[in-house]
Amino acid sequence: MWDPLVNEFPDSVHGLRCMLAIKYLQALEDTYEPSTLGHDLVRDLISVIRARNYVEATRRYHHFHSRLEGSSKAELRQPIQEPCYCPHCPRHKSKTGLDEQAHVQKAHDVQDV
């Protein structure tokens, strides 16, 4: 947990509130299994709080709120059935094909005849 005697305080009251909210959500995140919907929603809520741009934070919050309203309390502890492809969280982006160049053909070994 954050120790106020060791670390510096944020510049504003809003910054302090955001920091305390994130610390609480990180503690709450540990109560959910990593592959559950509840864990994913808590991570989305942390990203809403960390957004620096108002428009980006509002967009993330609407995405979070629609996912929360569409799920029941029992579903929060269930494993996620289909992966999320939201553009704002890099943990959901697929990493396949990132290390290959786009227009390079693969060479094939040909046996000597």
UniProtKB/Swiss-Prot annotation:
Residues 94-113 are annotated as: Disordered. Coiled coil: none annotated. Interacts with host SGS3. Pfam families: Gemini_V2 (PF01524), WCCH (PF03716). Residues 96-113 have a biased composition (Basic and acidic residues). GO terms for cellular component: host cell perinuclear region of cytoplasm. Keywords: Host cytoplasm, Host-virus interaction, Inhibition of host innate immune response by virus, Suppressor of RNA silencing, Viral immunoevasion. The keyword 4Fe-4S does not apply. This is Uncharacterized 13.1 kDa protein. GO terms for biological process: negative regulation of gene silencing by regulatory ncRNA; symbiont-mediated suppression of host innate immune response. It is found in: Host cytoplasm, Host perinuclear region. InterPro entries: Gemini_V2, WCCH. Belongs to the geminiviridae protein AV2/V2 family. Through its interaction with host SGS3, acts as a suppressor of RNA-mediated gene silencing, also known as post-transcriptional gene silencing (PTGS), a mechanism of plant viral defense that limits the accumulation of viral RNAs.
